[in-house]
Amino acid sequence: EGDISTLKTLSNDNSISGGHTYTITVTDTSVVASDLTTVYGKTSVAVDVSNVTTLTGLIADVNTVYAASSETSGLGNEAVTISDTNNSGNGVDVSTLNTLDDNTTGAVDAQTISAFSGSLANLLTAYGSNGITGLGNETASVTDTSTLAASDLNSLDSKTSGVVTTSTSLATLTGTVSALNTAYGSAGLSIQGDEAVTITDTTVNAKDLNDLNNYTSGVINADTLTTVTGTLVDVNTAFAADAASPATISGLGDQTIELTDTTVLASDLNTLD
């Protein structure tokens, strides 16, 4: 048994058939993950690391240690302090942090991370975990390219003061008009602005729908709407966007209209009709 620094100097004679059969017990309470990998590589016997209460190092190195379950014994409840920052500008792959979180019941200190990348679901998992500490000011690149829910983007936006950027290849945003306008209007979210939008409301205020239409050059699918409310001017603006070529709003035409004006021009009403 011994401290990790001494154990790293043990012979690693590859000429011995089957390798060394050192019985090793690490006496340190805090160990760098890459050093532990070096030590268990020197023996064919599982290294006892039950004295270790803290692992430090890069996420990849720590996960390598946990994955080598036949090489060590006594791991699973350690605190972990990681040293990753931004993966050379590409953002730390958040799925690897979630894997690490699953590998130990101890707290994972992630305060060195300055940038993430990954799916929105994985990002929300990391920020929602009680086992990960030190998060809250990272930038995040969301890699999803198919469909995202605006409410989920807003949730992620609320968990970090860093800017959250969606993929330039994102195809569709979905959600209520309120949630969508919140997402597009947030200084903490950077959304491309050319994605299609599918709204889920059955009733919407025309002004809010027009505001949404101004946020994206993609077509807004309003098929779920049964009622449109608002001033006649705003309602006419929304329906004109549906009638335009190319249209920027689709699905309007058979909704109940509830006007909020007290006085309207007959010509404007004829336009709506």
Question: Residue spans of the language-model regions?
Answer:
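General marker for long, soluble alpha-helical cores
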Residues: 1-273
